[in-house]
């Protein structure tokens, strides 16, 4: 019995000594992300969130999770949830405006949920009207639901002077 107690106590001491700090978990996640060890990076960032919910690194970890889930097209809903937490819980953080824009972008371009995309872009423009990405948000709003070819056609066809419509094309012989 006493051997069991000593073993359990020894394991507890070992576990408590091996707990990484929030900074170490952050750096570990960054290193794993750079090495393309995506699952390991996600685990490190998630550990940071779970073990250090008050850490100043939380919004950065949330953004990193969102970025990984978005760029690897692994889990778009998880990316949106991560970005939403930044916007809701850390509205003054440096990544908040970008997170808000990306919510709209993912709803529009990945999930094809135009209503949610519209709400997100409008929220972005209301919160960040002078942000450098505001023009992109307005463009996205103006073109919700259009396929890329339609948008390219709109941007490449010259407008007839004063009409707001593209001129009819004529073929010369």
Predicted regions and their residues:
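Sec-dependent signal peptide recognition
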Residues: 2-8
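Acidic, polar-rich low-complexity tracts and alpha-helical solenoid repeat scaffolds
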Residues: 5, 14-173
């Amino acid at each position: 019995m006493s051997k069991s107690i000593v073993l359990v106590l020894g394991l507890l001491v070992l576990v408590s000594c091996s707990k990484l700090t929030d900074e170490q978990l952050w750096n570990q996640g960054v290193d794993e992300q750079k090495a393309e060890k995506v699952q390991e990076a996600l685990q490190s960032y998630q550990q940071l969130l779970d073990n250090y919910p008050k850490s100043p690194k939380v919004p950065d970890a949330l953004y990193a999770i969102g970025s990984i889930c978005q760029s690897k097209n692994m889990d778009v809903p998880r990316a949106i949830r991560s970005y939403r937490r930044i916007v809701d819980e850390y509205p003054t953080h440096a990544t908040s405006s970008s997170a808000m824009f990306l919510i709209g972008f993912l709803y529009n371009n990945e999930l094809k949920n135009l209503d949610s995309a519209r709400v997100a872009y409008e929220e972005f423009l209301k919160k960040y009207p002078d942000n450098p990405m505001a023009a992109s948000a307005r463009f996205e709003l103006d073109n919700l639901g259009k396929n890329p070819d339609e948008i390219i056609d709109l941007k490449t066809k010259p407008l007839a002077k004063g009409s707001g419509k593209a001129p009819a094309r004529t073929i010369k012989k």
